[in-house]
């Protein structure tokens, strides 16, 4: 169902710390112009962890209404409280978004059987297509390929965003899961290998500033134009690397502000901005790479 370049959209904020909805509108226009496949709202890159429940709902509703069916919208859910998740899903059921991305439960250290029943229980509360989000570094919880494959046979669980960095899992999940189960790369830097092994797309942080390049790269790989894909990948590889200079979303928010996509680089605590050395290194990379994305569209 979901393929190609899905942007993990940042959440722009004013200097006061309030949500900057005008900048969100500009970002949506930027992604429509540059052929982004879908928008993931309030994921890790969207600072889900620092937003109130009310803010999360307002942001998703605004993005959904602004997109006006021109581009699919997926909402991120990061929680370990299943009742809070049900409450959030109930809101998303009312606005009929295209998908929900749900992380594995953090901190609680569940067994694989516990993880299976967790996602199974959540799936009973909605018909919205559900994507599992595996990011063991962030959550301390790792869903194994065998568990993913079992979950793939639940009707509305349609894919996984995998940020485990273990590329050997891609073929295992693809082989044992139901047909057309969607494997989405969760780390930009691994996109080339991940998709060549059977992935259908990427949920991309970098796409916030290289929407055109990211969508082009996915299209080239899916069409098996591997030489052109590798050429494009290695042209933007340094950008993928520099985005790892500090915890996400600090680097990408700075870059969006530097390139004029958002008005401020404000980020909520406990995240903090880049230091002078990191900014110098980032500017050097941005000056080196010739971006084709239509940034002046907003």
From Swiss-Prot:
Read off the InterPro entries from this record. Aldolase_TIM (IPR013785), DapA (IPR005263), DapA-like (IPR002220), Schiff_base-form_aldolases_AS (IPR020625), Schiff_base-form_aldolases_CS (IPR020624)
The record describes the protein's role as: Catalyzes the condensation of (S)-aspartate-beta-semialdehyde [(S)-ASA] and pyruvate to 4-hydroxy-tetrahydrodipicolinate (HTPA).
Q: Which domain of life is it from?
A: Bacteria
Query: Where does the protein principally reside?
Result: cytoplasm
List positions binding pyruvate: 45, 203
Top EC class for this record: lyase
* Reactions catalysed, as given in the entry: L-aspartate 4-semialdehyde + pyruvate = (2S,4S)-4-hydroxy-2,3,4,5-tetrahydrodipicolinate + H2O + H(+)
**Protein name in the entry:** 4-hydroxy-tetrahydrodipicolinate synthase
Q: NCBIfam families this protein is in?
A: dapA
The UniProt entry, under PROSITE patterns, shows: DHDPS_1, DHDPS_2
Subcellular location per the Swiss-Prot or TrEMBL entry: Cytoplasm
Which keywords describe this protein according to UniProt?
Amino-acid biosynthesis, Cytoplasm, Diaminopimelate biosynthesis, Lyase, Lysine biosynthesis, Schiff base
As recorded in UniProt, its EC number(s) are: 4.3.3.7
